[in-house]
């Protein structure tokens, strides 16, 4: 009797099942890596905003005014104006002739991570009329170093 060449149905099913399992594990690991990368970027963005705000504070003697209620600072410019001081702070377009501290406040990376609101853009608020303190609200899908996941805030005292 001649021996047939090839694989049996059972052998093929076992190989397909193993490939499927390995693919699933790779996708899960990749999604976790992407979430960690987005969160690391969020922390870096907030630190850059804090640096720009401190430079602004050193020059102006106070932090810039809050943006409109319900708005975010993402996509705006942080600058001063030499001709119209009231136009200093977060504006839609950088003021020509002024000092630019941050040409464009970054947008939070997408997609939104679990446990965060539908909009996770960075929201800046000056906490008092004297301009001595502020809050930047942001959200993390997972802990980054010592910073726990969830809704977080940054102030002149640091990131929490």
Describe the residue ranges of each PLM region.
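Conserved beta-strand elements of beta-rich interaction domains across eukaryotes
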Residues: 1-2, 141
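Short, surface-exposed interaction loops/tails
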Residues: 128-160
